[in-house]
Amino acid sequence: MNLEETMPLVFERSIPGRIGFSLPESDVPETKASDYFEQAYIRSVPADLPELSELEIMRHYTNLSNHNFGVDSGFYPLGSCTMKYNPKINEKVARFPGFANIHPNQPESSVQGALELLYDLQTSLVEITGMDEVTLQPAAGAHGEWTGLMLIRAFHEKNGDTKRTKVIIPDSAHGTNPASAAVAGFDVVTVKSNEKGLVDVADLKKVVGEDTAALMLTNPNTLGLFEKDIVEMAEIVHEAGGKLYYDGANLNAIMAKVRPGDMGFDVVHLNLHKTFTGPHGGGGPGSGPIGVKKELIPFLPTPVLTKKEEGYSFDYNYPDSIGRVKPYYGNFGINVRAYTYIRTMGPDGLKLVTEYAVLNANYMMRKLQEAYDLPFDQVCKHEFVLSGNRQKKLGVRTVDIAKRLLDHNFHPPTVYFPLIVGEAIMIEPTETESKETLDSFIDTMLKIAKEAEENPEIVQEAPHSTYVKRLDETRAARKPILRYQKEV
């Protein structure tokens, strides 16, 4: 029996006329939609929404939630995603009435406490990153990437340097990097990695030129390796007149140890929903603040949160600003959670976060390299990348290994990324997992490797114990069904 047979869609449960909620009687005159909208925007027939009782709705979504998997359910070693535990004190603080019940349209004088929190969060992020100013406006990581690149574009245009149309990105980069650069109007140039998994400095020198707007880097990179030549790379880019952009996806590996600003980066984006424990993995909301060096401050999105003698306020007087990038001022609830985390941990706690994240990753890497190929055999930072090429020769692919992990109640690691590693298995344990959990996962991975040798079919046909078996993911990606259509 599968999920489709036991759990119909909410639309399929609908019974015409069944009511789940009663609205109070209107205390304002009724008006017609046609009084406000053109006929072209008005439905000819009512929306086909499901009609259920409140109890039916509660049971439907509660049963669905029981089949979900999250950090609170079990180990979630999704590489490059930092699926760490989200402390519940964050949720308690975010639900304080003074935070949860305010509205962004309120007068600034009535939300001074909230503005103070945001300002203090900005100040903390300035210190953590080594930047000169931070804006909390971007809503997520890729949004922060795009915003940072738009600042760089505005900077070059302000200086009359319109020939700088290219952004250099490593071949190991996150996929959002080239996408963000393209959306920001840049051409993407790829710089190769060397045999050690690091940016090839010689190749960088070849591709940098007068048309270079920026170099986008993640440090440590997506292989979990620290770019030791970062200072030299910064000098190369700056001497050519370009800017250095820091993708903050992997900040968990260096937080409170080293700062991007001290490495030579001009723009930084952070993922507060990752590094600073805002819950993520369900599509949002996120928070992707960007930090900038002094010469880029004039181009920050408005408004800019400032502190004056009379209190906190938003400043719109930035004539060179790229303008708003989001209504209001960021995703406030996630920012509250991040602020709570930073204040709870303190500088010493954040340093321990980094140390344990790196320790856990190296411990797992050394334990697993006996059964899986390790393309870059060196000390890693917060994550590491194995290869399933050894298992592929036995007829077992990386995707099979990932599916088999589901039978053991583990979320699979990131697979087939970075693209420069064949049959990639990207593992990020984070700092919040115990040695017992790490050992359990290691034992399972070793068991699966042995199964690939002795009984490959059990891995190839996995998962066996999940409510939903293996799906046709290629078909789902290429021919998605994004809305319900009732059969006639």
From Swiss-Prot:
One of its GO terms (cellular component) is cytosol. It catalyses: N(6)-[(R)-lipoyl]-L-lysyl-[glycine-cleavage complex H protein] + glycine + H(+) = N(6)-[(R)-S(8)-aminomethyldihydrolipoyl]-L-lysyl-[glycine-cleavage complex H protein] + CO2. Its EC number is 1.4.4.2. Signal peptide: none annotated. The modification N6-(pyridoxal phosphate)lysine is found at residue 274. It holds the Pfam family GDC-P. SUPFAM superfamilies: PLP-dependent transferases (SSF53383). Keywords: Oxidoreductase, Pyridoxal phosphate. Transmembrane segments: none annotated. GO terms for biological process: glycine decarboxylation via glycine cleavage system. It comes from the Bacteria. GO terms for molecular function: glycine binding; glycine dehydrogenase (decarboxylating) activity; pyridoxal phosphate binding. The glycine cleavage system catalyzes the degradation of glycine. The P protein binds the alpha-amino group of glycine through its pyridoxal phosphate cofactor; CO(2) is released and the remaining methylamine moiety is then transferred to the lipoamide cofactor of the H protein. The glycine cleavage system is composed of four proteins: P, T, L and H. In this organism, the P 'protein' is a heterodimer of two subunits. Belongs to the GcvP family. C-terminal subunit subfamily. NCBIfam families: PRK04366.1 (NF003346). This is Probable glycine dehydrogenase (decarboxylating) subunit 2. It comes from Listeria monocytogenes serotype 4b (strain CLIP80459). The gene is gcvPB.
